[in-house]
Amino acid sequence: MQCLGKIFLSPGTKPESKNLIVIIFTADRDQRVLALSRIVKRPFFNKNPMPAMSQILDPIPNNQPSALFCCYVNATNQIQVARITNVPNWYFERVVFPGQRLVFEAVPSAQLEIHTGMMASSIISDTIPCEQLSIDPDGLAAGGFISPEKEHESEDMTSQSLVA
């Protein structure tokens, strides 16, 4: 196996406002892509959420009746690995960086395992039913971001639930 990567600098008017996009993929000897990661490094002052990574390499199996749009946010200061292992014939694993918002599709019965750790070791720090992570797909804007109106609605709901 070999790890290959490409680095892109997104267009912008000022150099300090550009985003660094690193695409890393692992391929076997026959040049078949086995894993794909996309890292977007935004300037510190930019508060926009990170774009959702597509699921073209591991779509939900066709025999599944329905799919949920889910959102997980890494609110820690450590790199995490999000993994779904309880759905037969489907493999889902993503690296989630601190502060990153991971938007993905899953079946209602799926369980998202969150692995946290250092270097070569990791432990399962949480298991979350994907039904709890489901979001309204109508709340997503065309670019894959949660629209500001929907984001404020969810913030209001969170503050209300904390008060209650």
From Swiss-Prot:
InterPro entries attached to this UniProt entry: DUF1830 (IPR014964)
Cited Pfam families: DUF1830
Disordered: annotated segments: 144-164
Protein name: Uncharacterized protein sll0944
Taxonomic source organism: Synechocystis sp. (strain ATCC 27184 / PCC 6803 / Kazusa)
